[in-house]
Curated annotation (Swiss-Prot):
Residues 171-250 form the Expansin-like CBD domain. Gene3D superfamilies: Expansin, cellulose-binding-like domain (2.60.40.760), RlpA-like domain (2.40.40.10). It comes from the Eukaryota. This is Expansin-A3.
């Protein structure tokens, strides 16, 4: 057993690790923002995270496509950011310095045919948010087209439990994880059938995680771990008669 003196360095390491993540999230950084998807935001549905209908996924219209410098090959799907129009840099901000919190749901790809400062807004290494129009119009005037912003990563507030949409076929389960609170970013996942042990899953693309086990006829449990190290276990969230194409959720498993 560790003595009190021996425990202190270990506890300090944990606190420093947690602080490093929290402090990084709380520091505002500069970027630019545009908008897409139409006035009703319908053009933002789907996207490179694989969420499909963003209402069903728990994310709604306040979303954005991230430049590749922020998107990180899909690893940042589900992250939440507070975005504020930078009134010191432009006259096109809405009065009052309004901020909006959005969820990362898509990739804004590079456009190498255009210069980075004239149309190629999402070209690396630019940090850029292509926001849904409804989200954009909370902070900036429509006619502006593009504005400088300040952003910082913030915790995600979600209603209800985490959702697991299962697609695939025998020996291949592709699970899309949505409505994730806390940091919002899934870093690791594991799956367990009622007749198996825990098996690590791998990210296939976006928010889609895969397993190559035959799990038909078994209830399914999942461990979801976020990029801040927090994790939850959703025991038997999918019953033994689960089927491909269905979404399963819990009201009690959330960050």
């Amino acid at each position: 057993m560790l003595s009190g003196m021996e425990k202190q360095p270990a506890m300090l390491l944990v606190l420093v690790t947690l602080c490093a993540f929290a402090c990084k999230r709380s520091v505002a950084q500069s970027a630019f923002a545009t908008f897409y998807g139409g006035k009703d935001g319908s053009g933002t549905m789907g996207g490179a995270c694989g969420y499909g209908n963003l209402y069903n996924a728990g994310y709604g219209l306040y979303n954005a496509a991230l430049s590749s410098a922020l998107f990180n090959d899909g690893a940042m799907c589900g992250a939440c950011y507070t975005i504020t129009c930078d009134t010191s840099q432009t006259k096109w901000c809405k009065p009052g310095g309004n901020s909006i919190t959005i969820t990362a749901t898509n990739l804004c790809p590079p456009n190498w045919a255009l210069p980075s400062n004239s149309g190629g807004w999402c070209n690396p290494p630019r940090q850029h948010f292509d926001m849904s129009q409804p989200a954009w119009e909370n902070i900036a005037v429509y006619q502006a087209g593009i504005v400088p912003v300040n952003y910082k990563r913030v915790p995600c507030q979600r209603s209800g439990g985490i959702r697991f949409a299962i697609s695939g076929h025998d020996y291949f389960e592709l699970v899309t994880v949505t409505n994730v609170g806390g940091s919002g970013v899934v870093a690791q996942m594991s799956i367990k059938g009622s007749n198996t042990g825990w098996m690590a899953m791998s990210r296939n693309w976006g928010a889609n995680w895969q397993s190559n086990a035959y799990l038909a006829g078994q209830s399914l449990s999942f461990i979801v771990q976020l990029d801040d190290g927090r994790k939850v276990t959703a025991w038997n969230v999918a019953p033994s008669n689960w089927f491909f194409g269905a979404t399963y959720s819990t009201s009690w498993v959330q960050f």
